[in-house]
Amino acid sequence: MAKFDLTAKNCQYLDRHLTFPLLEFLLQKDIYDQTSLLKFILQTVSKTNMVDYTMDIRERLNMGDELPEELSKRRANVLVKLKELQTEVAPLMKCMEELKNPDSMKDSKSIVHALQQEFDFKHDIIKSAQKLAKYLYECGNYRDSISYLYICLLVMEPADKNYLTVLWGKLAAEILVLNWPTALEDLTRLRDFIDNHNFSPIEVLQQRTWLIHWSVLVFFNHAKGRDLIIEMFLYKPLYLNAIQTMCPHILRYLATAVIINRGRRNALKDLIKIIQQESYTYRDPITEFLEHLYVNFDFEGARMKLHECQTVIVNDFFIIGCLQEFIENARLMIFETFCRIHQCITIGMLADKLNMEPDEAECWIVNLIRNARLDAKIDSKLGHVVMGTQPLSPYQQLVEKIDSLSVRSEALTVLVERKQKAKTQESGEGNWKYY
């Protein structure tokens, strides 16, 4: 399924360290030639100080398990440089340890003032701390890097030219150690900085595009992420504009979030509108599934796309963890839409629409009824599912009636248009024969 693989597109907007998990994931999928992929990883890792990882890739490429002289010298140089930077930064670490309650101080100026008053603090040492954090990060020592980046953010002013770089570094490191609560805090902090800083239009568009890609990693691993990704990507115009302008492929992840989030079904109409607008620049089985189901009311097309969606998700690093939820919710969406048009359905017909065996479909409906997520009865003798009606207020009845009529009208309109189009094509073919 290389056709729908987004790894190359996504990696353009990720720090090279963030690409390593994606590339290792691809190695397990046999989508691309293993040797070519390993060579690309080796080329990428050679730009870091991760000597051990470099050796691991060399071994997998059968390049020998002995440490080449070049790498041996590089490792020695890395250790020397690391020791130098740690010595330079040691006074700052000691000061921060002895400083009482730095977190409770209002801003960086207060902390720096306290450090200058009590410890004869020199501002240049912050640059050394930033260099050390970056060096540790390049060595793959992300946890220690976070400690220094945290201190840098405590003592640096937002106006500092390196402040934005430190924010990005902190977010990357938190993602790489899988610390999702703090990563979300850093993501919010970085987004606020980008939105309120005086960037040029091109710069701010680039920053938002990078942030969108990094945030996908956070949102699909955080408990609140499924709501937050919808709020940020669909309902923040500046970020929606960035997606439409720079990276419409991100609609895959927005669509996935809406599908697996039952509490956000109200976002479907807005999402589908965007998917239709961008269909000329990007489409995949996930976006097409929604189009088939909610625009064309093509249940057969939706069923076929759902099958393709499973293959896409299995091969996508960002959303593979959502596979079962996606299938369950997509089936439920097909079922709900189908039931709004038909009140009585045969289990066989339903099984066909849901890509299930009849027994499996019946069991699935029984579980829905048992869990109070569906008001329906099963007539096992006739093999029918009869939709129930719950008592509603007059207002709710009116809304439901209008909604149901709207869905049926749209479905009929699409059906009539489809038949008319078929007749026109047949007519055109007939006329052509006379020439």
From Swiss-Prot:
<keyword id="KW-0648">Protein biosynthesis</keyword>
<dbReference type="GO" id="GO:0003743">
    <property type="term" value="F:translation initiation factor activity"/>
</dbReference>
<keyword id="KW-0963">Cytoplasm</keyword>
<keyword id="KW-0396">Initiation factor</keyword>
<comment type="subunit">
    <text>Component of the eukaryotic translation initiation factor 3 (eIF-3) complex.</text>
</comment>
<protein>
    <recommendedName>
        <fullName>Eukaryotic translation initiation factor 3 subunit E</fullName>
    </recommendedName>
</protein>
<comment type="similarity">
    <text>Belongs to the eIF-3 subunit E family.</text>
</comment>
<dbReference type="InterPro" id="IPR000717">
    <property type="entry name" value="PCI_dom"/>
</dbReference>
<feature type="domain" description="PCI">
    <location>
        <begin position="219"/>
        <end position="392"/>
    </location>
</feature>
<dbReference type="Pfam" id="PF01399">
    <property type="entry name" value="PCI"/>
</dbReference>
<dbReference type="GO" id="GO:0001732">
    <property type="term" value="P:formation of cytoplasmic translation initiation complex"/>
</dbReference>
<dbReference type="GO" id="GO:0071540">
    <property type="term" value="C:eukaryotic translation initiation factor 3 complex, eIF3e"/>
</dbReference>
<comment type="function">
    <text>Component of the eukaryotic translation initiation factor 3 (eIF-3) complex, which is involved in protein synthesis of a specialized repertoire of mRNAs and, together with other initiation factors, stimulates binding of mRNA and methionyl-tRNAi to the 40S ribosome. The eIF-3 complex specifically targets and initiates translation of a subset of mRNAs involved in cell proliferation.</text>
</comment>
<dbReference type="GO" id="GO:0033290">
    <property type="term" value="C:eukaryotic 48S preinitiation complex"/>
</dbReference>
<dbReference type="GO" id="GO:0016282">
    <property type="term" value="C:eukaryotic 43S preinitiation complex"/>
</dbReference>
<dbReference type="InterPro" id="IPR016650">
    <property type="entry name" value="eIF3e"/>
</dbReference>
<dbReference type="InterPro" id="IPR036390">
    <property type="entry name" value="WH_DNA-bd_sf"/>
</dbReference>
<dbReference type="InterPro" id="IPR019010">
    <property type="entry name" value="eIF3e_N"/>
</dbReference>
<dbReference type="Pfam" id="PF09440">
    <property type="entry name" value="eIF3_N"/>
</dbReference>
